Structures are given as C-alpha cells and as structure tokens.
Design a protein with these regions (language model features):
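Bacterial Sec-dependent N-terminal signal peptides
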Residues: 1-30
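Membrane-proximal, proline-rich intrinsically disordered regions
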Residues: 20-66, 71-72, 94-96, 246-249, ...
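Conserved, well-structured interaction surfaces
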Residues: 41, 45-58, 79-154, 168-182, ...
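Short, surface-exposed recognition loops and adjoining beta-strand edges that mediate ligand/DNA contacts
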Residues: 62-78, 163, 196-212, 225-269
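TPR/Sel1-like alpha-solenoid repeat signature
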Residues: 140, 211-217
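Short coil/turn linking the two alpha-helices of tandem helical-hairpin repeats
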Residues: 151-153, 158, 199, 220-229
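Short, conserved phosphate-binding/catalytic loop or strand-edge motifs used
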Residues: 160-167
C-alpha cells in the first residue's frame, strides 16, 4: 500500500513539474531582440531610423561648426572656446570638439554596421528583398558619410564592417586617409544605386542625396590623387601643384548633374 502511494505521489509530482515547466516556457512577444525584431519591412525601416539622429549629436552640437566653418575661416568667434582655436589654428588634442566628433563618427559606423549585419543575419521570410536593399543602402550612406568626415578631418581612420567582431580586436592599425575616403565612396556609390528616388518618410535619404554627397567626395579624391581612378599608388604628394585629377572632377560633375537634372529640386524664386 505504501509503495502504491509513493508511486502515485511521484507520478503526480512529475505531472505538476511538467505542467509548470510548460506554463513558464513562453516566447518573448514584448521585448525586441535580434531573432524576432526583423520580421517585417516596417521593422527594417525602424532599425535604420536611429542612424538619422542621436548618433550624430556629439558632432552636430559644436564640432560641426568649429571643425568645418571655423577651420575654413567662414566664421569667427574669438571668445568661444570651441570655435576660436580652430579659426586661429591653435587647436590641440585637448581642444573641445575633437574627441566628441571622433566618438560620434564611430558611433555612426558602429550602429550602421549593426544594422547591416543584423538585417543580413536575422531578417524573417516575410521581409522583402527590396526592403533589405533599401535598409542596407541607408546604413551604408550613413557609414560612408561618417568615414568621409574621418578621412577628411584626421587623414587616418580605422575601417571595419562588423562591430561585434571588432569588440574582440581592440588593437587595429589605422588606414590612410585616402583609403578611408575611398571606402566612403564605395558605400555612397552603393547607396546611390540602391536608394529609392523618393523618401519613404520626411527626412529620409534618397538616391539623389547619395549622388550629391558623392559629388563632394569625388572632389576630395581629385585633390588626393594624381591621375585616373585610385589604385593605391597614385596618391598626390604636392597639394599645391595647381591641377587636380580630371577623372574625379568628371565624376563629380556627372554626380552633381544627375541631382540637378533628375532630382525633385529647384531654385528659390
């Protein structure tokens, strides 16, 4: 009798534990995660949305003016600690804006890489190929723009395409500025070919946005290279030579012409 009671109790306990385990095992339907987030075209659009705002803040806040218009002497602000050092050519490694801008650009790079790789690895079967290509193009637009700034302002930069892998590889030699800008051009060329002609929402980039930025990047390469398409060795050393690489000047003209003639833009009345 005791043995029967023991067997019944054991079976009852097993059933209770099994039912409890089933009750406690549920799929995550509320918190976003890599495995389940990228399940619709709208989710991909949401994944690239952050690339338009906060990641740029530390650059746009002050450094945009000091390192851009300030250094070009388009503005002056003698009593400004974050503009005057640049207009007066007295900035140092500790000058306001430098570290913030560097961090901001690499935040853009990191988040763009995350978007590209997560979409590639975790997109569900319901996601259309068109939505994936559009998302890749938006992320590469932002990454390319950040790398153009890095190459132009520091003349060196660390190029990488997988943020998760980079975390485990903290010592990486910097690439030459011209190589960084070449990488940026490749990103923008991809964006120009694959972005839509019209924005899906106000403020989103289009193919004409990419062609406009490309025109500016080609002008940079016209001064950094001597003749023909960049091949790793035709790097200019005399920046006062009085001429520019006509290959990239022509590329810049074509990209700008495409925006002017085909884009939905017009001069103000």
């Amino acid at each position: 009798m005791k043995n029967k009671i023991l067997i019944i109790a054991t079976l009852a306990g097993s059933l209770v534990l099994s039912s409890c385990e089933d009750f406690l095992t549920h799929d995550n339907t509320t918190s976003a995660n890599q495995e389940t987030f990228f399940d619709t075209d709208e989710a991909l659009e949401a994944a690239t949305a952050p690339l338009y705002n906060y990641v740029w803040n530390s650059f746009n806040d002050k450094a945009y003016y000091s390192m851009g218009d300030g250094r070009a002497n388009n503005i002056t602000a003698r009593w400004s600690d974050y503009i005057y050092p640049y207009t007066n050519f007295t900035e140092t490694a500790l000058s306001p804006g430098l570290e913030d801008a560097w961090g901001s650009f690499y935040s853009v790079v990191a988040q763009s890489n995350y978007a590209i790789n997560n979409i590639k690895d975790y997109s569900g079967p319901q996601v259309s190929e068109k939505a994936k290509v559009q998302a890749y193009a938006e992320a590469r637009f932002m990454r390319g723009l950040a790398y153009w700034y890095i190459g132009s302002l520091w003349n060196k930069g660390i190029i990488y395409e997988n943020t998760a892998e980079q975390v485990n590889n903290s010592v990486v030699p910097a690439n030459r500025g011209v190589d960084v800008i070449e990488f940026a051009i490749r990103d923008l060329e991809y964006a120009a070919v694959n972005l839509s002609k019209t924005a899906s929402d106000v403020g989103r980039v289009t193919c004409y946005s990419a062609y406009a930025i490309l025109s500016r990047m080609y002008l940079s390469m016209a001064g950094l290279t001597t003749e023909g398409e960049y091949n790793g060795s035709n790097i200019a050393t005399d920046f006062n030579r009085g001429s520019r690489n006509t290959y990239y000047l022509d590329m810049a003209r074509k990209a700008a012409t495409k925006v002017i003639e085909e884009g939905p833009y017009s001069l103000l009345d």
